[in-house]
Amino acid sequence: MAIVHTLPVPLEPARETATAPKTPAMGSVSSLISGRPCPGGPAPQRHHGVPGPTFFRQQDGLLPGGYEAQEPLCPAVPPRKAVPGNSFTYVNEDFRTESPPSPSSDVEDPREHQAHNAHLRGPPPKLIPVSGKLEKNMEKILIRPTAFKPVLPKPRGAPSLPGFLGPRAAGLSGSQGSLTQLFGGPASSSSSSSSSSAADKPLALSGWASGCPSGTLSDSGRNSLSSLPTYSTGGAEPTTNSPGGHLPSHGPGRGALPGPARGVPTGPSHSDSGRSSSSKSTGSLGGRVAGGLLGSGARASPGSSSGGDRSPPPPPPPPPSDEALLHCVLEGKLRDREAELQQLRDSMDESEATVCQAFGARQRRWPRERGEDCAAQAQQATQRVQRAQQLLQLQVFQLQQEKRQLQDDFAQLLQEREQLERRCATFEREQRELGPRLEETKWEVCQKSGEISLLKQQLKESQAELVQKGSELVALRVALREARATLRVSEGRARGLQEAARAREQELEACSQELQRYRQEAERLREKAGHLDAEASGLRDPPVPPATTDPFLLAESDEAKVQRAAAGAGGSLRAQVERLRQELQREQRRGDEQRDSFEGERLAWQAEKEQVIRYQKQLQHNYIQMYRRNRQLEQELQQLSLELEARELADLGLAESAPCICLEEITATEI
């Protein structure tokens, strides 16, 4: 339902539209992308006025080279001040419906496009590719959405011009609303234009849909719009009776209404220059066509001005001319294009809202991810730095140890060098000191060599004398060996005699022991014999009379019996005593004989012992004499050697002190 109010046209344009281009040109679909409000707020309402100049203005604090400032993606639009005393036009949003996504587009594409288009005011950042289309269009700065609303089929009948414009009046701009009033004049022109537009509409729509799949108009559409003739209407402005009031028509230089519609959010619009130029060109073209068809006295019917009522068509007007039909067909095509553009705007709104949400979420997620990445990289860098620091500390410690060890080695080498230098100095000093001593020693060696040659000659003579003395010593040794042999024989004989005497002494001791035993036994036998004599004397007494009948007599008779038995045994004891006495006498005689023999042997052994002792004394005397003779021979040999040396020295004519040199002194001076 479109409610049209009368709006006075201001003589001076608003400040916001002062910088708008005065010569509108047909723009592409991509130039019609407008700034969208943030999703989740009130329902967006379209503002069909001239766009403000701040479309690509850089917002303060929005993406200043980084992601530190987190500001809202779509800042609040300040409301515009309403002009007092003006009426407004309400446009029904019939075409603002949910458009399904294109099959060729990805689910994430609208969100990416919305997030990117929300920041068209500043330099857009590089988005991370999430779909195939974004990867293909990464080289482009501006990512254009491709989600379009499909074109609705048009009826095949020939409705009237108000019925044709009724369901589409909500998606048209203010200038197009005025065209609706202008085409409500003659019935023949509206019916013929409706039939011609209905016949040509499918072909035009299909051609436009096939020629503009990427959001831009085709070359043929641009040529057709740019080649339209410019007509100027010279009559009065037609007015249309409507329930909302009176709407004046527009001249060729005015185009669309500059005032904002009621219910549309005031403030600077976010649409670009292409969209404003397209709306202006459409409005001016509609004004020209309306002026050429109707003239100064045309009036629109109340049913066609409302646009929303399905009233029966008025009586057929007279048939218009060919030029009017052509203008009607073109006007119908333009309305279809505007409706499709409105659908595209709605789809752009939805896609941009999704892209805005995605980009906002990604913008909020980017600092966190960047912070996490930076923290991880910082942690890794810290770990690497710590490992490198530990490695450097270990290397520094090793180098310090090596340096300390090298310093110790260097100090030790310096000490060794000093010691070697001192030793070299000592050796040089000793060499300088030993030089003259070496010369003296060489002279002394020469002198000693002469003395040695002389001594060698004397030694030869002494050796000859020693050979002679040696032969004498050999003869003496032979005599000594013979004397030793005789001495050994005599010693053997003396040793045999000593052994025999020792054996005799042992036998003598054994005999003396046996004699002592016999004496003890004889003493014992004497005592026993005395005892037996005493018993025998007791037995010689008269026998006791026989016992009486008294019991005491019986006891005495027993004792008498014992005495009689003992008297019988006494005779046998006497015989045994006599025999023992005889044996004792024999033993005494044999002991005397053995004593005599032992005494004779002892005397003989004593004589032999004395003889051996005399022989040993004589042998010792001979040894002593031989030792004395050897000493005398040695003294004589030494005396002869001294005399020989003195004689040789006298022959050589040496000093008198020369004979004092002896062998011991020569050996003492040996080098």
From Swiss-Prot:
Region Disordered: start and end of each range?
Answer: 1-131, 149-324
Sequence ranges of Low complexity compositional bias:
187-199, 242-283, 296-310
Question: What's the source species for this entry?
Answer: Mus musculus (Mouse)
**Gly residues bias (residue ranges):** 284-295
Polar residues: bias regions: 213-241
Family, as annotated? Belongs to the LZTS2 family.
Question: Which stretches are tagged as biased composition: Pro residues?
Answer: 311-321
Name of this chain's protein: Leucine zipper putative tumor suppressor 2
